[in-house]
Amino acid sequence: MASDLGSSLTSIDWLPQLTIQAAMKGSQQNNAGRKGPGSPTDPSAMLSKEEAAAHRDGKPPYSYANLIQYAINSAPAKRMTLSEIYRWICDNFPYYRNAGVGWKNSIRHNLSLNKCFRKVPRPRDDPGKGSYWMIDSCPKEDVALPRRKRPHPDDEVSQDSFEQDVNKSPLRSASEVSMPQEGTQGHPMNNNSPLPSYSQANPTQMPPDSRAPTYNNNDCYKFSFSESTFPDLGCSFRSLYHSLLGKQGERGDKDLYNSMQSKQVLPPVHSEVQSSSCCMYQQNSGAAPSNLHPHNVPSISGPPPPHHQAQHQQPPYLPQQQMPRPPAPGMSLGLPSDWCSNIDSLKESFKIVSSLDWSSVDLSQFSDLMESLRQAELKNWSLDQDHIASLCDSLSHLLSTTGLLPPTHGQPPSCQAPCMPPTTSSACALRGGKPVHNMTVNSYGQNQPPPVSCGHTFTASSGYPIQSQAPPTYSQQGRHPQRALYPPQRPTLRYPQSSDDIQDDFDWDSIA
């Protein structure tokens, strides 16, 4: 039984006699008939004549690397061309003469991929074709390159979606934002949304939030965003914003900012006189003048006629059905009607607007422009297409109001801007026996006739003549006079002490 167990395959009694030296000798004896594949172990090994004669009839038991090594070492210069290697193999081993061309491809692959063989260029003084191949005794080891981990298919999908989200992000530079062409449906610049009106009875009541501005398809204000550079527009809007805020000396930046925060449209204080609730009637002789509004022209007035009282009991800020005065020829600054149709004219308009004196303009009427500029300031002037359209629309409203922009042809002036509180009076001054138009005072203290003549005439014993100046040009809204590049001097108004000191030397027929 024990002998059976000792002779079984599971017996390991041979393990103590196993040594490395004996294993190497046994492997050499087993592989003596055929050389192992791969690089040759001895770079200087040569094929003996006995081995060559023993394997002339059949396929030699050598690898292609060993055949190349034997061929190169047989040459006196230890180098051979590819054609010489082919010839040597065919001469020593006739088997490869009729073996086809596949073995030649294997020889070329071994020369190119095996590090033991090195290609040497042919010298200039050696005529012939092809480079030489030599045996490299010290081949360079390849540096182990880190293998790139192949991403999971789910990771590739997530990476593609992330790149798409980055490309669609609004935080890209302004020059990469795709803009609609001129022929597409864009955002025109003409805003006709009405501004909220206020009543004198409750001036602190906040109006409801106004709707988003609507745009109509007006070719005059259709802006082309295809060639625009938004950084330049941002600088222009920023300079306009600071010029509007920096030149409000009389009101102060704090009051203007508070008015924009609360979105209250204050009644104009430097515009023309709101004299629709106070007609110039004369008081009885010797009566002291009553408390006057700081922006109304002082006059000695009496009780109005009964049929005229109902006209002046309405609040002074309700809109009147009046036609504004068209701008007079020759007094415009030359700003074209298509000022915002391209980028060059828009920049030129900013130069004209920035050179004006904004200290005499009541910016509370342009709360939409100031709010748009303030929002752009908070966003560090990174403007998108819709914001540029809103700013251009607000700027066109400002230019139209100040008289810099001529009215659009084919459209009535009253429809090109929101309805604003009236700035001209519909009442009449009294002059004995002569119809007299009511006089209003603009932002520079100049007196001017209203755009529409009064429908009622009255007579009185005496009147107060107001010195008339040349009327400034009106825009299509008829609310603000157009100013030149420098503000005119404020005329000094004379305030008489009594009606006896008035000298009526004014030609009233000249303004009829």
Curated annotation (Swiss-Prot):
UniProt xrefs under InterPro entries: FH_FOXJ2, Fork_head_dom, FOXJ2/3-like, TF_fork_head_CS_1, TF_fork_head_CS_2, WH-like_DNA-bd_sf, WH_DNA-bd_sf
tRNA processing found in the keyword field: no
Polar residues: bias regions: 170-204, 456-479
Top-rank taxon: Eukaryota
Biased segments, Acidic residues type: 501-512
GO molecular function: DNA-binding transcription factor activity; sequence-specific DNA binding
Pfam families from the UniProt entry: Forkhead
UniProt keywords, alphabetically: Activator, DNA-binding, Nucleus, Transcription, Transcription regulation
GO cellular component, as recorded: nucleus
Expressed in which tissues: Expressed broadly prior to stage 23, after which expression becomes restricted to dorsal tissues. By stage 28, restricted to the notochord and floorplate. Expressed almost exclusively in the most ventral part of the neural tube in anterior regions of the embryo. In posterior regions, expressed more dorsally in the neural tube. At stage 35, expression remains in the notochord, neural tube and brain.
PROSITE patterns for the chain: FORK_HEAD_1 (PS00657), FORK_HEAD_2 (PS00658), FORK_HEAD_3 (PS50039)
Disulphide bridges, residue numbers: none
Comp. bias intervals (Low complexity): 311-323
Protein name: Forkhead box protein J2
Organism: Xenopus tropicalis (Western clawed frog)
Top-level taxonomy: Eukaryota, Metazoa, Chordata, Craniata, Vertebrata
Chain's gene name: foxj2
